[in-house]
Amino acid sequence: MKKRYFNMIPSPDTACILLYGEIGGFDGINDKDIVSELYEYASMYRSIDVRVNSPGGSVYAGMAIFNALRASDADITIYIDGIAASMASVIALCGKPVYMSQYARLMLHSPYGGCYGNKEEMKAVAEQLEALEDTLADMYASKTGK
């Protein structure tokens, strides 16, 4: 049986996707599976509700999910059930609209990572982190208008 990385709860016009867990990693939310299932659901449902409870995770896996949600023909509504931290907060930007309980949390931070290597390799990683930070700031600014 295929492992499902999130649950889909159908209704006549709306699919509800539960995006719970860490994005990326061995046991986390797999972007390839999510994106392929999202495209499948978008072809069957006019609206997709995405319920988020995630500490975040891989920036690049999250970007793939973000881009798929943004490109979807379905109307995407995001509900933050518990926490949308780190990359999950970026995925939450896809909602038109976004709903959040007064008890839920939205948490942001600059991207981070590590590396081993010589000074040129370390400098390249620092430059990549700066570029990612600029990209993420643009994404937040686009949603908030600030």
List PLM regions with ranges.
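Terminal-region recognition feature
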Residues: 1-146
